[in-house]
């Protein structure tokens, strides 16, 4: 009998501190940086974001999302036999945030590791977890995207600091006799390393050089729309499906213009896209599971529907996962 994996529970968490565009405009104004709510909304679609308190780490956010996902799945932490955390902002250089999360959950003993593919991280992690479940290396996986991007933002650069927020999203993936995760497609192209990066070097546990995010927005935009379309068509071809067969498109919540451009290329209406970007900004690896959980809890995304998840991130990395909920 063939073995598959299926999502049986979702969860998400946003830290309490919520900054609207007006709040951020006021804070930046104190630094002599000019921007406006209109400028931010027009260019990004973002209206608010959440920032974690200084003593809150990625694993803390991951813990809250993981508990909700386990609750939704009707499982205990001890039922989990694999933990993968997608993050670019781990608690420390090592050990992995996944190991720290494992201890906080009380799920000690199972394999636990981090996966770093920036904003593509959750799609990568979900694909890896699916492969391990299909291979029999795990029966019940916890896959989390968690980020505290507020720690690596340059608040003197209005083109980047308005984009990102902190948060976490999680899913529980369980072995199944019927297909849940249908297929995935992952890609990377290292020649684009410099267009989205934190260029500092880590030495002795300290970041040397430039420790804040740098982005060539125009280059990212042009590349993102093309590779997202490629990834979507790749997974659809593997499954023998067409865009019209997809009930919901759940993209990385990066920028509304990128999301609209992708929908146009796939000839899918925005009414079939889950959009939560306006309320939490770009939360990197956390954005897709955040959007998925929100849509599930709102009753928009329902069991049996076909979902297309797609992401693009620094590296340059990109990918897509096609699944039935």
From Swiss-Prot:
The active site is at 119, 252, 282. Its EC number is 2.3.1.180. It catalyses: malonyl-[ACP] + acetyl-CoA + H(+) = 3-oxobutanoyl-[ACP] + CO2 + CoA. It is found in: Cytoplasm. Residues 253-257 are annotated as: ACP-binding. It is an enzyme of class 2 (transferase). PANTHER family: 3-OXOACYL-[ACYL-CARRIER-PROTEIN] SYNTHASE, BETA-KETOACYL-[ACYL-CARRIER-PROTEIN] SYNTHASE III, CHLOROPLASTIC. Homodimer. The last Arg residue of the ACP-binding site is essential for the weak association between ACP/AcpP and FabH. Belongs to the thiolase-like superfamily. FabH family. This is Beta-ketoacyl-[acyl-carrier-protein] synthase III. It comes from Verminephrobacter eiseniae (strain EF01-2). The gene is fabH.
